[in-house]
From Swiss-Prot:
Metabolic or biological pathway: Carbohydrate degradation; glycolysis; D-glyceraldehyde 3-phosphate and glycerone phosphate from D-glucose: step 3/4
Regulation: Allosterically activated by ADP and other diphosphonucleosides, and allosterically inhibited by phosphoenolpyruvate.
Required cofactor names: Mg(2+)
One Gene Ontology MF term: ATP binding
Keywords: Allosteric enzyme, ATP-binding, Cytoplasm, Glycolysis, Kinase, Magnesium, Metal-binding, Nucleotide-binding, Transferase
Active-site residues, as the UniProt record annotates them: 128
Gene: pfkA
Keyword Cell cycle: no
Chain positions recorded as substrate binding sites: 126-128, 163, 170-172, 223, 244, 250-253
Binding-site positions, ADP: 22-26, 155, 186-188, 212, 214-216
Family stated for the protein in its record: Belongs to the phosphofructokinase type A (PFKA) family. ATP-dependent PFK group I subfamily. Prokaryotic clade 'B1' sub-subfamily.
Subcellular localization, as worded in the UniProt entry: Cytoplasm
The protein's name: ATP-dependent 6-phosphofructokinase
Natural source organism: Vibrio vulnificus (strain YJ016)
Length: 320
């Protein structure tokens, strides 16, 4: 019987994490459970920075970006002795189960705790939308709006100066954020891990556009694929048109979550508590075709793959 639940946020922050925490806290308290917030992710869990939360702890947080519990990178959590200490801290507070909000690295920590017999539920909180078993992650659509606003502003200045602009977008090894941003932002070209890059073809396409009277272009590029500034130099040399790179960086993680992300996070937080009360542990939550689902967290990490949105890549190709 679950009586006390812990909740933490880990890895890169994402808009909507506070709404997810609120969903966990309010649902658990309403069911007569105690809730404990763990500050600064797995690092705080290891160091024992754990505090009991009440309803007022999550008042006025649903509209705030970031995470009031804080987050931290803590690669040392891979070590067995570190996790054993973390579990000791949980048991010292009488915490029976843990809700972890974060990306794939956070899921890996939850997986390790699960393998050590400690029940965890993972909620997908990352702007990268790179978690298997869910159509959307918490924060993804808010970040999408942030990127689109930036692209709109870049288009204003690019058209004024007849300039080619490269905009580097987060996502790591997943091109979802870049793909959707490129379609919604009306970008002329897209470079993601799924599409790869043929530089000669790209420069040729830009030259063809210039010959037809096109005065500017926006290129959407997923981070980590290449150096955006070096690519800008190559394009400028190949086309004779001024080319500049803009790295959006961490601005994509900030800002008030959209209504969609607030509702999604609230639903997932609520669902996580109900799963724990029903005796489920070692699960991760997702939303598929607007329905909440849960998967084995080990299977999700080791075996499940995110589908490539070939339908949207086809749309993008035909629109560009």
């Amino acid at each position: 019987m679950i009586k006390k639940i812990g909740v933490l946020t880990s890895g890169g922050d994402a808009p909507g994490m506070n709404a997810a925490i609120r969903g966990v806290v309010r649902t658990a308290l309403g069911a007569g459970l105690e809730v404990y917030g763990i500050y600064d992710g797995y690092l705080g869990l290891y160091e024992g920075r754990i505090k009991q939360l009440d309803r007022s702890s999550v008042s006025d947080v649903i509209n705030r970006g970031g995470t009031f519990l804080g987050s931290a990178r803590f690669p040392e959590f891979k070590e067995v002795a570190v996790r054993e200490k973390a579990i000791e801290n949980l048991k010292a507070h009488g915490i029976d189960a843990l809700v972890v909000i974060g990306g794939d690295g956070s899921y890996m920590g939850a997986k390790k705790l699960t393998e050590m017999g400690y029940p965890c539920i993972g909620l997908p909180g990352t702007i990268d939308n790179d978690i298997a078993g869910t159509d959307y992650t918490i924060g993804y659509l808010t970040a999408l709006n942030t990127v689109i606003e930036s692209i709109d502003r870049l288009r204003d200045t690019s058209s004024s100066h007849q300039r080619i602009s490269i905009v580097e977008i987060m996502g790591r090894h997943c091109g979802d954020l870049t793909l959707m941003s490129a379609i919604a932002g009306g970008c002329e070209y897209i470079i993601t891990p799924e599409t790869g890059l043929d530089k000669e073809k790209l420069i040729g396409n830009i030259q063809d556009g210039i010959s037809k009277g096109k005065k500017h272009a926006i290129i959407a590029l997923t981070e980590l694929m290449m150096d955006a500034n070096e690519l800008a130099k190559e394009i400028e040399a190949g086309t004779g048109r001024e080319t500049r790179a803009t790295v959006l960086g961490h601005i994509q993680r900030g800002g008030r979550p959209t209504a969609f992300d607030r509702v999604l996070a609230s639903r997932m937080g609520n669902y996580a508590v109900h799963l724990l009360m029903e005796g489920h542990g070692g699960r991760c939550v997702g939303i598929v075709k607007e329905q909440l689902v849960h998967h084995d967290i080990i299977d999700a990490i080791e075996n499940m793959k995110r589908p490539v949105r070939n339908d949207l890549f086809k749309v993008a190709e035909e629109l560009f």
